[in-house]
């Protein structure tokens, strides 16, 4: 949201406001823990939470987990790539997202449906992640996963969507894909 405010302020010629919100739009860097390579909650002393598990669904992350919310820097993909150590490391992390499957003991929330590894297509915060392979010059992986989702998670039946339609987002993803 901060980045959007900055862009609007810039278009309106409000440089001071734009600069403030561009700076705020980089705050995601403050919760990136290089030791775990995830965005991670901090405690009241500013230290990263010690018992953090990226695949856990906790009160610190709304309707998702650390794997799914890591990629929520849509306004600065190049910055996120840089945080992870470059395109090769970023692509490896993407690969892990799609291959690190929940265990049989994991109690997934109701909204975590359409799972491919930690990617939850049934919950909208993941929808853009498949396309991030394009940013690291591996478009064939985007194409492979998009085809998989379209062919396996959208069915010609009353239960045709694998998740919550949320104002048409599931259908819109399909149409745009």
Where are these regions (language model features)?
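Active-site core of glycosidic bond-cleaving carbohydrate-active enzymes
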Residues: 1-177
